[in-house]
Amino acid sequence: MARTVHCQHLNKSADGLDFQLYPGELGKRIFDNIGKEAWGLWQKKQTMLINEKKLNMMNVDDRKFLEEQMTNFLFEGKDVEIEGYVPPAEDE
């Protein structure tokens, strides 16, 4: 049976993550308050950030920047801004 959480990002009940994917207190907060769907949305944004900003995960400053962006996206409702990216237009 899937674990259910009240996802803070989506503001609804959602399937919870299967295990803690991020270390420390922030990882516990994500595990307790973020659903699989929201985590998937973050992973897409994270990949775009790493690629477009050429982040190096061996660099402490780059990891700190990415963690700040993750917190802003998942818990504060701030979208990730990526220079030059224009979302595809929705067909009407």
From Swiss-Prot:
The keyword Glycoprotein does not apply. One of its GO terms (biological process) is cellular response to oxidative stress. Belongs to the Fe(2+)-trafficking protein family. This is Probable Fe(2+)-trafficking protein. The keyword Iron applies. Disulfide bonds: none annotated. One of its GO terms (molecular function) is iron ion binding. Could be a mediator in iron transactions between iron acquisition and iron-requiring processes, such as synthesis and/or repair of Fe-S clusters in biosynthetic enzymes. One of its GO terms (cellular component) is cytosol. PANTHER family: FE(2+)-TRAFFICKING PROTEIN-RELATED. Keywords: Iron.
